[in-house]
Amino acid sequence: MSFLPLLALLLGVQVAISDLYARRVSNRALLLASAAAVAWLCVQWAVTRTGAPTAHVLGAVAGLVALLPFYAIGWMGAGDVKYFAVLGLLLGWTALLPVWIIASLCAGGHALCIYAVRRVRPMIPLRLQFLRDTTLQHLEHHPAADQIRRARQGRVGIPFAAYLSLGALLWVVRNTYAVSP
């Protein structure tokens, strides 16, 4: 496995954990990964005159341009947009559509589950509702729940960056270990 897909996987793990835990994507991690990718692409191109960085630069621009409208209308966080642009830089523009499709399907499934739970909740028998409420009250006062609540600082929503990480992981594994016909 080459350096850039490996870097994409490592960044994906960090982003997924951060997004699931705090609903936040670290600018520092994105900047470090971008700097490492640009340095790697420049050195590779200067030394071997192969692997022109065009596909990677186009990937970064396409990733930013593709998701920026969703940020502008409030459907997505800025961290998701920046992370998608960095994925474009790391993996090239050809990875963006499959990664986006996988992430969107996962996020759509997540949204459908939330919607279904809200619709089914009134149909639950009262005894089960009481048990659920009691369990949630116990979990709500657990130190880990308090820590997560403090880390999120009121941020809610679907962890799209975590789903982008999953899409990137699947794309890298498929392109690295796929059997050619």
What do these predicted ranges mean?
Residues M1-P181:
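A membrane-topology feature that recognizes alpha-helical transmembrane segments
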